[in-house]
Curated annotation (Swiss-Prot):
It is an enzyme of class 2 (transferase). This is Histidinol-phosphate aminotransferase. It catalyses: L-histidinol phosphate + 2-oxoglutarate = 3-(imidazol-4-yl)-2-oxopropyl phosphate + L-glutamate. Homodimer. Pathway: Amino-acid biosynthesis; L-histidine biosynthesis; L-histidine from 5-phospho-alpha-D-ribose 1-diphosphate: step 7/9. GO terms for biological process: L-histidine biosynthetic process. Belongs to the class-II pyridoxal-phosphate-dependent aminotransferase family. Histidinol-phosphate aminotransferase subfamily. Keywords: Amino-acid biosynthesis, Aminotransferase, Histidine biosynthesis, Pyridoxal phosphate, Transferase. SUPFAM superfamilies: PLP-dependent transferases. It comes from Roseiflexus sp. (strain RS-1). Its EC number is 2.6.1.9. One of its GO terms (molecular function) is pyridoxal phosphate binding. It comes from the Bacteria.
Amino acid sequence: MPASITGLLRPDIAALEPYTPIVPLETLAERLGLPVERIIKLDANENPYGPSPHALAALAAVERDAPHRYAIYPDPDHVRLRAALSRYIGQPPERIICGAGSDELIDLLMRATLRPGDTMIDCPPTFAMYSFDAALYGARVVPVPRTDQFDVDIEGVAEAVEREGAKLLFLAAPNNPTGTPLARSDVERLLDLPIILAIDEAYAEFAGTSVVDMVGACPNLVVLRTFSKWAGLAGLRIGYAAMHEDVAAYVWKIKQPYNVNVAAEVAAIASLDDLEERMATVARIVAERERLAAALAALPGFRVYPSAANFLLCRITGGAARARTICDGLAQRGILIRYFNRPGLDDCIRISVGRPEQNDALLHALRELV
């Protein structure tokens, strides 16, 4: 046995700052001394209404009528799911790749694109997984900060691409954690740059806008989507990406063959078959977003940023200490929201939009705290 096992591991990983995920619900409930059913979870942008009834019925049908499906490997080509997605987004199946959540697709695209020493542009504040994955592959991450209103600095990005020779740019649209939309005209300008532009549309259904129709004509455009938010399937880890078929051929080569499990595929297809119910749920969340935004803006010391997603970012007068105090105070009452201990957001909290009664409980608690 070697004297030091760490000597056989990648030394750069030792210095890598790990990504901080949401603490599991059961762990938080135990830590707070509360039963799980007492917790109001507004910290991870999940769908408060859960999966489609059609999806739940489809899963129950597999368990009842075809349990053997769980004992055999899933379809490595996701033929039925890609056909359903083709009808949903209007792109042919050969432009669609499925994965275990959009997180896997972010990783796959970086694996297909970035070599050690290559450069990726990041536009903070944004989803931290972009810079984390890029660092994992030994890429240089060049930040181009967003404006005070969290818009993308298009000219700054163009200058950075030319100056740094960057290959890849990830942009969430709407952005997480700010909820800021991305104009189609800005996407068109960015597509003129000599980079691969990955648009992460995890919250597109809540925004009502998309650029997925552009992938056929734009070989350097990749659009990522997920079933975690609008479809309420975060626990099953299912997402997909649409891209030009030339790029898809590269990504397909490095995709693990059985990366989407049977349950996830069954639930995703059933959700796509139940679009009327799912879109009605999305509409309810959007309506609640606007009601909640107005109520939060009326609280003393709250600045609420406009959002096109299923969450709201609030800047708190009094700085980081006050924002953290509010977050902790809500947690003691069994209400979980997100505090970001990072530059530019350390005086902010992010609140996922819940059901009306959950939002009312949140507002009642906030009025006590502020």
